[in-house]
């Protein structure tokens, strides 16, 4: 498909929707329950096109008179005499071969295209509401807005504190927010370790470290610090796509396809952006940040952390 979107030229976009009510088919003016179809030669009634798709809970008979196989899903087929019949998807392949397969592929492509057209048209019609949801996510997901979280993260590891304090936080706090302290092992612990290594001989004792690391604090959601660039990408995604969304009528097909592809990630990206804002708010809480004081011994460093954490009390 090239040029202008072909779906908008269709007489009725609804024809591509999956039919689940058999009454919709029976009410069609050209529908017949059974027709004698000629599969070879030039004479007789031929398959014209596939014009609809259905799926029912109960099985129905194929409309090809010589077939009659029961099936639950299939297609509405138009015939060369203007009539329409129901045709099982397997029946069509068995009776019409490549011709049916090609028409089936074409119909499916048109149906997918129609669904995409409707999705983009709905996105265009709901654009203002979508913008408001996006802005609400940035501003009101928690106590702190997106920008305030961004500034808080910068203040924590980007320059809001002294160089020494910042480097200590970066070096001593793991990416998951764990803070460990190195402490001496007891003689009993070292003896147990040697025993576990299977070497208790005083002459050939293997090296056993005299110290161990113990967890002294955990900064909740600290990994947001190192993932915040992803939040910025999500924000950029919404700002850009809100500028790009427009009425698909008359839209060049290459632009249409590109926008539809980007739009598929909209809901998932919104959830991810909201998650970043929620977790950023949990990170920047006084009782969470105050745990960083365990990294420092000097009163001025501890005071600096307390003052920083106090801004989020």
Feature roles, as predicted:
Residues 115-146, 206-313:
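Extended, amphipathic alpha-helical scaffolds
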Residues 14, 34, 46, 59-61, ...:
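Context-gated lysine
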Residues 8-9, 14-20, 80, 86-184:
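Domain-exit/linker segments immediately C-terminal to small folded modules
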Residues 5, 30, 38, 49, ...:
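Detector for Asparagine
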Residues 153-225:
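Charged linear interaction tracts used for macromolecular binding and regulation
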Residues 1-71, 76-77, 83-86, 91-101, ...:
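N-terminal cysteine/histidine-rich coordination modules
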């Amino acid at each position: 498909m090239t040029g202008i979107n072909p779906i908008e030229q269709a007489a009725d976009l609804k024809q591509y929707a999956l039919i689940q009510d058999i009454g919709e088919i029976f009410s069609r003016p050209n529908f017949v329950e059974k027709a004698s179809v000629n599969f070879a030669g030039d004479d007789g009634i031929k398959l014209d096109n596939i014009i609809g798709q259905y799926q029912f809970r109960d099985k129905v008979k194929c409309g090809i008179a010589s077939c009659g196989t029961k099936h639950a899903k299939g297609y509405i087929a138009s015939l060369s005499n203007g009539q329409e019949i129901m045709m099982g998807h397997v029946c069509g392949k068995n009776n019409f071969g490549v011709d049916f397969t090609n028409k089936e592929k074409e119909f499916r492509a048109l149906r997918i295209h129609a669904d995409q057209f409707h999705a983009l048209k709905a996105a265009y019609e709901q654009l203002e509401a979508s913008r408001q949801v996006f802005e609400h996510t940035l501003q009101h997901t928690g106590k702190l807005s997106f920008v305030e979280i961004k500034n808080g993260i910068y203040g924590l590891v980007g320059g809001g504190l002294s160089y020494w304090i910042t480097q200590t936080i970066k070096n001593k706090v793991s990416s998951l927010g764990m803070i460990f302290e190195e402490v001496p092992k007891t003689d009993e612990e070292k003896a147990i370790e040697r025993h576990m290594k299977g070497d208790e001989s005083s002459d050939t004792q293997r090296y056993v470290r005299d110290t161990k690391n113990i967890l002294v604090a955990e900064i909740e959601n600290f990994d947001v610090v190192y993932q915040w660039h992803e939040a910025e990408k999500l924000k950029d995604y919404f700002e850009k796509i809100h500028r790009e969304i427009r009425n698909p009528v008359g839209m060049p097909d290459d632009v249409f396809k590109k926008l539809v592809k980007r739009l598929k990630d909209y809901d998932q990206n919104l959830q991810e952006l909201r998650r970043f804002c929620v977790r950023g708010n949990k990170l920047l809480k006084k009782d969470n940040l105050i745990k960083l004081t365990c990294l420092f011994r000097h009163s001025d460093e501890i005071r600096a952390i307390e003052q920083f954490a106090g801004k989020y009390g």
